[in-house]
Amino acid sequence: MRESLKPALVVATGQRRSGTYGPLSKLAAFAMKFVGWRVEVVDPMPDKCVVVMYPHTSNWDFSVGLFTKWAVGLDFKREHLCFAGKASLFKGPWAGFFRAVGGFPVNRRSATGFVPQMAERFAAEPLMRFVIAPEGTRSYTPHVRSSFYRVAVAANVPIVLGAFDFPNKRVVVNAILTPSGDVDVDLAAIADYYNTIGNKGARPELAAPWVFR
């Protein structure tokens, strides 16, 4: 039985939760407010979920996302809001930084595959909000990748929908979808959500349509 997208509580820009990042949260909230960005984040966020950030069209997405994470100051440790990266990112001079902000390497050559690796990680963690860009690239593609959906289904966790809205200078993470197993219906609901909020990435022409390959 499919649950429809449920709008969630909007959190004011820069609102902090106690004991998360301390002064860093305050500084990041001030910085985002200073440059005119607003942040709307689901509250409470599910303990375990796949967080989709769309569209991913620019290198600026990472910086804006990172400042959002710090500014909002949700009550979880940095490793509980995480993202996956190719193994090479965690071997060079930036390895420590990527780990510090919640990144972890994924073995793309593993016989088990990406989805089983992530499902296993979800099962092992008491708290895990896994952030993923559904396109998997900043370049235009005629589809989004299905990995975010398959991970959510395999791990039995909801999908939290987030958007980078560069023209209006806002980050919106304010809807939750429980996968029904009917991929076409769920993708249509996701596409409708993004059309409704009218988000545009840094380069809107590079945003992928909500279809799987």
Q: Where would I find each of the regions flagged by the language model?
A:
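Charged, glycine-interspersed solvent-exposed loop segments at helix/strand-loop junctions
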Residues: 199-213
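Short linear sequence motifs
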Residues: 30, 186-187, 205
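Soluble catalytic domains of membrane acyltransferases
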Residues: 14-17, 34-196, 210-212
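Extreme N-terminal tail/first-helix region
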Residues: 1-36
